[in-house]
Amino acid sequence: QVQELLVASPKYLDRAGRPKDPDELANHVTLSISEDEARQRWELHGPEGAVRRVDLQPRVAGFDFPLLQSMVKDGFGITMLPETVCAEAVRNGELEVVLPDWSLPQGICHAVFASRRGLLPAVRVFIDFLAEHLPPQLEASRLDCGGACERAKEKIKASALGALAVDAG
């Protein structure tokens, strides 16, 4: 299984604000991995089993993970990326987890082939290789969300306190 994360650059979040609730995503620039450029629905699972579906109109849609990651690192908006793609950038502070108390459904990786009968030996070796090596690599790329998510939560609290101080002043 592959965990998806909502991520953005600290630069973008400092400028546009850190969403505290999934509904606030509609007020942000989003970049999406989708065939449908017009609409996108992100389903988030929150504390105590809450489920929220947020309809968005992404500014950019495509299937190129490295391009989307590069764009969000440069401050273009918020996107959903597989943890395996963005974990290192989150660890080193280039990206920040958005809505750290909420999660996205996990994706599942499948190897699909027509039939075992007539399966080329090279294909069988490749499938066996994936079955052996992919799960440990996925596990190694998992974020210890304790650190990264706690930093994101602290920034959300700090921005909320800053907004309260401005309102009170």
Residue ranges and their predicted role:
Residues 9-12, 36, 47-48, 115-117:
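Short loop segments at secondary-structure junctions
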Residues 29-48:
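Secondary-structure junction motif
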Residues 53-97, 104-105, 124-127:
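Hydrophobic hinge/microswitch elements
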